[in-house]
Amino acid sequence: MASSSSSRNWVYDVFLSFSGKDVRVTFRSHFLKELDRKLISAFRDNEIERSHSLWPDLEQAIKDSRIAVVVFSKNYASSSWCLNELLEIVNCNDKIIIPVFYGVDPSQVRYQIGEFGSIFEKTCKRQTEEVKNQWKKALTDVANMLGFDSAKWDDEAKMIEEIANDVLAKLLLTSSTDSAENSIGIEDHIANMSVLLKLEAEEVRMVGIWGSSGIGKTTIARALFNQLSRHFPVSKFIDRAFVYKSRETYKGANPDDPNMKLHLQGCFLSEILGKKDIKIDHLGALGERLKHQKTLIIIDDLDDLVVLDSLVGKTNWFGCGSRIIVITNNKQFLRAHGIDHIYEVSLPSKERAQEMFCQSAFGENSPPEGFEELVVEIAWLAGSLPLGLTVFGSALRGRKKEYWVKMLPRLQNDLDGNIEETLKVSYDAIGNVKDQALFRLIACLFNHVKVRDIELLLADSGLDVNIALENLVDKSLIHVRNDHVEMHRLLQETGRNIVRSQSTDNPGEREFLVDSNDSRTVLSEGIGTRKVLGISLDTSKVSEFCVHENAFKGMGNLLFLDISSKTFIEEEVKVHLPEKINYYSVQPKQLIWDRFPLKCMPYTFLRNLVKLEMHDSKLEKLWEGAMSFTCLKELDMWASKYLKEIPDLSKATNIEKLDFGHCWSLVELPSSIRNLNKLLELNMEYCGELETLPTGFNLKSLDYLNFNECWKLRTFPEFATNISNLILAETSIEEYPSNLYFKNVRELSMGKADSDENKCQGVKPFMPMLSPTLTLLELWNIPNLVELSSSFQNLNNLERLDICYCRNLESLPTGINLESLVSLNLFGCSRLKRFPDISTNIKYLDLDQTGIEEVPWQIENFFNLTKLTMKGCRELKCVSLNIFKLKHLGEVSFSNCGALTRVDLSCYPSGVEMMKADNADIVSEETTSSLPDSCVLNVNFMDCVNLDREPVLHQQSIIFNSMILPGEEVPSYFTYRTSDSQPFGTSSSLPIPLLPTQLSQPFFRFRVCAVVSASNGVYIGVYSRFKGRIGNKFDSFGEVHNFMEIEKGIHLCIFDCRIRLYKDNVPLSQLNYDHVDINIHITSGDWRSTVVLKEWGIRLLETGSSAENRLGNPNSTLPHVSQAEEGNMGYYTHVQGLVNEIENSEDSGDNNVETERSKKRMRLHHFI
């Protein structure tokens, strides 16, 4: 397989294909000289005469060149050498080709006509018809490309210069850097920077490269410089050494001191011109020397505005077309200089990060066998930061796997010194002590916390939170995404190390405690001091202990206490409190304590609280009477199942959020809640004993109200509100106020906890309250809901509609189209007979356990449908084949539809009928023409015992990623079969003879059917080995196919496979393969269960179908090339065993094995 341009290191920039008879001493010599002037390397053959023995060198030069410039001249086609060069160029899929028509009309080359065509025909007389056709196609293909026609140029020198500029522009976007490690992803950065630089403009433009330390700003800038410098007569990369020296020069000086600025400018001009000790006698001299020069200047790691103003103060200091690029981690610094064109360097994707790490650790883009999971783990530990990836890779390079495993704990817990040194520079450069304090606070306690929460908790801290956050963002030390503050893992660890350095011996002397063992020590031994501002203790990382009775006595400044588990594993109380404990000096602002062991809260803990969070506590009550907790904003007692009452909140008037979800012992809400005029959220879900709500609500600020599964709640009060999210599902509410209206409601969920129709008012009274603002509506278990009124058509913003277990619902409105609706769920509406038709924009359609009898032909109008599930539809009899016309459809399930007998077009209005004939296609030509261009599906017909399977099996225009059918034998449709029953965890092989025609296509396609006996889901993997008579071999590893919906029984598991037929761009037919061994390996989705492969079969499929043509490159939407999922890496062990078995059963000949994808590159895809 040819290397991609993003990973290939090229020997030459250009290969020039030409006829020496026409252009050797004219065009060629001038063009090569222009390339030299632009520092573009080109392959030369001046001193060699072409002979047969030199062809391998020419062939290699073509492969090693990034761009091919093909000069078509009158006699080009007279040379078989030229035509073979052209053919080789075209066969290199990664080659950029620039055609030049020099003294010849492009149409003569394109169609091989005129004088050019006559010469071509003479050359072809000595060749076979096959060679002639290959040359013709190559000439036509290249002549159809955008190029240069000399007839349109009056000045050949200008044409040559323009061709060279075109080459340079293409190299700018595609050339790799000197280091393969640094080249990964660099093209994307260069392309984005090219847009900002706007090189074609004559203006002088200043551009900033902005990003956090270690993210690769300098790497990008150097790659840019390597490519751009050829464009500029004067160019200089000003590195950090000069910048640091300039800082020292300026340090302590008067910013307005002209002598200091003159000195800086003199040093700067010396750097640019490469001369020592240039003296400048006035501040305008720098501009005078450069204003007529097209200049490229890149300044690295600068954040001092005075220095920047002195060096590149104004655009008119530089000549037309100049570009000044400034690299910094301070965005405000760029804005202050008037630089508006700023490129933000973001972290690489997870996949790119792993490639970068592999380049550093292995010198390749992918890991060796056995290192896959370690690479994923270490790339995550580096947080995808390029600096971390490089440092970690260098530390592990050349080491054995055992060493890597031993190093993991150190990488998890300790920050590498080189990384910390680099990142600490960014911290030191913050300058403002308040901003530094907030940086440490975020690193230790507030990473991934809402901005609003940070603002509330630090409202009176004097830290100027909003300004400090903005400054940290500008310096690339944090990001704010979705209203949450995010700090990179390595920056976070740097901040924590800064705090640890405050006291290496006594953690009680640090401002923040974040190491759980240190926190445990301070709390259990009572050694905390007034320096401690915050404690975070992850209970999942410590053993059980008791807090010292004087633990809080010395920590009078403690503001933030977080004792919680960072895992989802339930655990017993880990942190105990003694009966006599001194709380009086502690007044935290935030108290988070999972499984708090006391029955009542200590009062002193509450006085200044802004946030109180006590999940799964032992509390029975919070406090007595009406306490004046005016600072309290959030009260979260989730899952405190012993809590019997909510205290008087009448004096806690600033509360914005109350969460008593899963507090099973609560019986009522206190009447004082109606005084909470700032309340935004009230969550009471799963409060199973809650019976009544206070009346007289006037909570105009309330936005979210949740009474889900409050089974005993029977009344709902009238109250004024601007609520947007109301959840009343699984309640026993019998009646709603008649004038209840929510004008701003966006999400509404309601339903009954029982099905007693006598107590159910139904949904009709709710119709008037349904506002056009509604985006989500859930109606659950409403027995007397028979139909929906036509007023539904007014819900133009509705995106999701769930009507579930409404067993008497018979119809939906017709003649309406809810254009915003993308998800419709009618699960359990057993009397609904007609397929819904209320929106053609639906993506997700759940019709499980409905009474629908057919999927009609109109299903083809659901253009955006991606998932259709109709499990347990016992009345379903027919499914239209039009379902396969939906190109976005990926998952279909008709399992347990016992009445389903056919999947066909019998109800299509044109009257198209199915055709059956022995040994013939089962679908007519007319039917086939109406099927889709491409469709990749996961289909489930499990337990559809009456289904006619033939029409489905014969669909070659559909690519089945997985299909489950009923049956206990391989259908006759599969022409190659085996019947040897295989127990759990084993494999089976089928030899298939190959015809030359089957290897002349770009893909080898086949369909597999495995008869599987299993109790639950299974995975089936495929491995193919092509073999020839001379011992040559070619391996292909397919994906792992997921059949996780399988239930206990015997089923047919069917899936399609596609193998790319290539080996370094040579068709397999040239490698003389005469048969292929196709092997499948089956494993259970649950290690506790067994699976038996009873028999299996294969049918070869035609290639070149419309589906194949649309899908094109195998690295597109086909599941065979999707990314591996970490959870199933263990499957590779089974496949390797399979390969080993095959190897052992054959004669040795490993040197002849060409592997399409090495085992380390095997990829998994799981359909969920």
From Swiss-Prot:
Record-linked InterPro entries: AAA+_ATPase (IPR003593), Apaf_helical (IPR042197), Disease_R_plants (IPR044974), Leu-rich_rpt_3 (IPR011713), LRR_dom_sf (IPR032675), NB-ARC (IPR002182), P-loop_NTPase (IPR027417), TIR_dom (IPR000157)
Catalytic activities: NAD(+) + H2O = ADP-D-ribose + nicotinamide + H(+)
LRR repeats by residue range: 539-562, 606-629, 631-653, 676-699, 701-720, 721-744, 795-820, 839-865, 873-896, 1065-1089
Protein name in the entry: Protein VARIATION IN COMPOUND TRIGGERED ROOT growth response
Signal found in the keyword field: no
Induction: By DFPM in the root meristematic zone. Induced by salicylic acid (SA).
EC numbers for this chain: 3.2.2.6
Any one Gene Ontology BP term: signal transduction
UniProt similarity note: Belongs to the disease resistance NB-LRR family.
Domain NB-ARC residue range list: 187-452
Organism encoding this protein: Arabidopsis thaliana
Subunit details: Part of a nuclear protein complex made of VICTR, PAD4 and EDS1. Interacts (via TIR domain) with PAD4 and EDS1.
Any one GO molecular function term: ADP binding
